[in-house]
Amino acid sequence: MAKIDIFNLPKPVMQTGVAGKKLMFAGTNDLGKSFQSARFPKPLLLAAEAGGSAITCPQIPIDNWSKFCEVVKQLTADSTKAQEVYQTIIVDTVEELVSRCEESVCRRFGVADISLVQSADVKKNPNGYSYARNQFKQQVNALSNAGFCVIFITHSEENEVTDPITGETFKKLFPFGYNKEKSSNRFVCNLCDFVFMLVPQGVDPETNKTILSKAICKETNRAFARSRFTQMQTYIEAFTAENVTAAIEEAIKKEAENAGAGLVEFTQVNHNFNRDDYFEMLKPYIAKLAPLYPEYVAKVIAEQLGENRKITSATEDEVAELGAIYDELSDFCCSRGIVVD
C-alpha cells in the first residue's frame, strides 16, 4: 500500500490555471452565475435547481441524491478519460444539492424530516444531520479531488454582524448557510480555493442595458469573499469567465514569485487506493466491528456491494464502493470512540 512517501515528496510548486481549482459564485438571482460558469472550458452542469433552460452546455438534472452519486462515480472512476470530455463541473446550487442529500437520508430511515432521525444507537437511527453531512462530504470531496475545475453556485443572504473592534452593527452579505457552523454549505465554502460574491451594478443609462455584475474576490466590511492566494485582486469589475480566469492566473503567478516557488501546469497526481489497498485497510475494521455490530456491518456492505456480498468479492470496478464502506466504518468508530488496531 505504498501510495504516499513522506520522505520523497516533490519540491513545492504552484499549479497555474483553473484546472483542479474549486470556485464558488455566490449572489442573488440574475447576476450571471450559471451563464458565466457555463462559459468555462468543457462544462457539465449538475442542475440540482431547476433553471438551466437558458444554459446551452451539457447538463444533468439532479433530482435525487443517488443520481449525483452515480455522476460522481462515473467522473472519478477514470478522471483522466472523463476530462477529455468535461473539464469544468458546475454544481447549481449547493443548497439544493444539500436538500437532495437530506431527502435521501429521510427516505432511508422512513421519516418526513431529517430532524426526526435522532437516535445515536446504531440499531435504531444515527443523528440525521451528522449522517447527511458525512454522506455529502464524501461525495463532494471525491468530485473535488478528481482534477476538474469544480464551480459551486449558491445564493447569498444578508446577516447582521458586529465589528469586533468598533462595536458597530451592520448588514453583510454571505454565501447561503455560511453562518451555520456545521452546515454542509459552510463546508463547501471552506473547501473552495476562491469564493466570489457577486453584486449587481444596475443599468447603463445611455444604453438601457444591464451592466455586468461585479465580483468581490476578497472579504470587505459588507461582503464575505475569500481566496487561498494573498495576491488575488479585491474586485473584478466585470464578472465574466475570461476575467475570472485571468484574475486567478495572475494571483497564482504573483504568489509563486513571492514564495520563490515553481509554476507548472496542472497535473493529476494519483493518491487513490486500489482494491487490494482497501482489502487491507478494511480488515481491522471488520474484525473489530463484526462481532459487536454484525447487522450494521452487513447493512453497510449490502448498501454498497449488494445483498449477500463479501468485501473480498468486490471487483476492480467497485473501488469507489469499497472507499464508501471504509469511510462509513471509520466514521462510525471515530464517533463512538472505538479504537481499531
Residue spans for each PLM region:
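Conserved GTP-binding G-domain of TRAFAC-class P-loop NTPases and closely related GTPase folds
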Residues: 162-273
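Short, well-ordered beta-strand core segments
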Residues: 43-45, 150, 195-197
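Hydrophobic/aromatic ligand-binding patch that stacks against planar heteroaromatic rings
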Residues: 35-37, 142, 187-188
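Conserved P-loop
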Residues: 4-91, 95-100
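P-loop NTPase motor core
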Residues: 96-183
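Interfaces that engage single-stranded nucleic acids at replication/repair/recombination sites
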Residues: 2-4, 16, 31, 39-40, ...
